From Swiss-Prot:
It holds the Pfam family ATP-synt. This is ATP synthase gamma chain. GO terms for biological process: proton motive force-driven plasma membrane ATP synthesis. PROSITE patterns: ATPASE_GAMMA (PS00153). GO terms for molecular function: ATP binding; proton-transporting ATP synthase activity, rotational mechanism. The gene is atpG. Transmembrane segments: none annotated. Produces ATP from ADP in the presence of a proton gradient across the membrane. The gamma chain is believed to be important in regulating ATPase activity and the flow of protons through the CF(0) complex. Belongs to the ATPase gamma chain family. It is a peripheral membrane protein.
Length: 314
């Protein structure tokens, strides 16, 4: 009985220590998620204006650009998977990987797939299964910079422009997590290359800026706000690489906010579970202690009665 009580107390102390760790991680994630949300919002106006400018140029440029050229029969496609570098974030990384696997399964019967990974969790997943990884980046999943996005975008553009016979790709798809709220983060798939210039209002940053008078303007109306020097084609040559880097950067920021939100929820759930387990172990320890005391009293009373019976009678 004493050993059982000691084990319960040791386990309770261990759970209490774990609770302190998960509580600290919950508070850290909670404090960082505010900064991540503000960063996403701050990046929105630039992304929106870049999309508007690109839409305006594209509407007045009839020449086809290499980054917008669609191959009717793609032979090789790439999938960029954005996950976290660390665990303890619930199902955040596994949801992204599952979505990427579904995309790969859909594409694979028709073409070869090149895998680009961002985040150690994705790298560990693919390396554990012995699958080939063409490019990988890690170390900045929860605090990405534009420089990180630019590095990724440069590799993507380089591979897209390279012929497939030399290891290039015809299409590049990106799988990331879109931050909708603290409670909702949704894995999303977009085709990054070849570029399809969309209405700014259809982009996530355009939806964030809903209500802006300029958001609903069409390309013809937007055109009158700009002069293209030396000509629209040259401007398009400069804008398209910036647009690719911006899309990657915005996806990294969305993923970082989603990762922190998932970690905050996971650590809160772990802290709550630890508290419940501590209460259960405390109750079991008290019951074991009461049982031990009752047993000791019973033994004392029984021993006293036995002594009384064995004592000589006068």
């Amino acid at each position: 009985m004493a050993s059982n009580l000691r084990e319960l107390r040791e386990r309770r102390n261990s759970v209490a220590t774990t609770k302190k760790i998960t509580r600290a991680m919950e508070l850290i994630a909670s404090s960082r998620i505010i900064k991540a949300q503000n960063t996403v919002k701050a990046a929105g106006p630039y992304s929106l204006e870049l999309t508007r400018a690109l839409s305006a140029v594209a509407a007045h440029t009839h020449e086809e650009h290499p980054l917008t050229s669609m191959n009717p029969d793609p032979k090789r496609s790439a999938v960029l998977v954005i996950t976290s570098d660390r665990g303890l974030a619930g199902a955040y990384s596994s949801n992204v990987i599952r979505t990427a696997e579904e995309l790969t399964t859909a594409l694979q019967p028709k073409q070869e797939i090149a895998t680009y990974l961002c985040g150690r969790k994705a790298v560990q997943y693919f390396e554990f299964r012995g699958r080939k990884v063409d490019h990988l980046w890690s170390g900045f999943s929860d605090s990405p910079s534009y420089r990180d996005a630019k590095d990724i975008a440069d590799h993507l553009i380089e591979d897209f422009l390279r012929p497939t016979e030399e290891g290039g790709v015809d299409e590049i798809h990106m799988v990331y997590t879109e931050f909708e709220s603290m409670l909702t983060q949704t894995p999303k798939v977009i085709r990054l290359l070849p570029l399809a210039v969309v209405d700014p209002q259809d982009t996530p940053e355009g939806q964030l800026a809903e209500g802006d008078p300029g958001v609903g303007a069409n390309a013809e109306e937007i055109f009158h706000e700009y002069r293209f020097e030396p000509n629209p084609v040259s401007v398009l040559d400069e804008l398209l690489p910036l647009y690719v880097a911006n899309r990657v950067h915005y996806a990294l920021l969305q993923s970082a906010a989603s990762e922190l939100a998932s970690r905050q929820r996971a650590m809160k759930a772990a802290t709550d579970n630890a508290e419940q387990l501590i209460q259960t172990l405390t109750r079991q320890a008290n019951q074991a202690r009461q049982a031990a005391i009752t047993q000791e009293i019973t033994e004392i009373v029984g021993g006293a009665a036995a002594l009384a019976e064995s004592a000589p009678q006068e």
